[in-house]
């Protein structure tokens, strides 16, 4: 039988991001050509949020306004953290007080071809994972 606490590392205890957590949405984004970590991150966030609707959220937010919603984005990126445009990622989220946390993760794999006309520097595909947490 698996020892889940050891497998999951148990590193995230006592998280104080929000008092009330409503949603955690998961997404994946890739940049197939061009090795652009920001493009992959934006696609991951879009993938996480574009399959959801939260029509009752205003009714539980303080003062009934989306301005009081807190949104935390966790991005697992494989490389080029210094090239990640966090402000561009934040613009994908239309409402709330947005924070972004970047951690090591994601994936690099080969596309099998280098396409200079697509700004390829090599044959790597950049894959980013995103967790978008919504609460107040």
Task: Describe the predicted segments one by one.
Residues 62, 66, 112-115:
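Metallocofactor- and cofactor-centric catalytic cores in central/energy metabolism, strongly enriched
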Residues 4-17:
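Short, Lys/Arg-enriched N-terminal segments with co-localized hydrophobic residues
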Residues 70-114:
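Mid-chain, well-packed structural core segment of small domains
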Residues 66-68, 127:
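Short connector loops at helix/strand junctions that flank enzyme active sites
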Residues 18-61, 76-86, 126-136:
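Conserved mixed alpha/beta catalytic, RNA-binding, or beta-rich assembly cores of soluble enzyme
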Residues 15, 62-64, 91, 121-123:
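Sterically constrained small-residue positions within well-ordered secondary structures
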Residues 98-136:
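C-terminal edge-of-domain segments
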């Amino acid at each position: 039988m698996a020892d889940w606490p050891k497998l999951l590392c148990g590193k995230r205890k006592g998280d104080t991001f929000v008092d009330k957590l409503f949603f955690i949405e998961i997404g994946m984004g890739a940049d197939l050509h061009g090795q652009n970590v920001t493009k992959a991150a934006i696609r991951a966030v879009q993938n996480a949020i574009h399959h959801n609707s939260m029509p009752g959220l205003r009714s539980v937010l303080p003062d009934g306004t989306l301005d009081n919603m807190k949104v935390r984005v966790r991005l697992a990126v494989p490389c080029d953290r210094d090239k990640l445009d966090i402000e561009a990622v934040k613009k994908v989220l239309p409402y709330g007080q947005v924070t972004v946390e970047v951690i090591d993760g994601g994936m690099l794999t080969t596309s099998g071809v280098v396409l200079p006309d697509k700004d390829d520097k090599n044959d790597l595909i950049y894959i980013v994972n995103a967790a978008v947490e919504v609460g107040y």
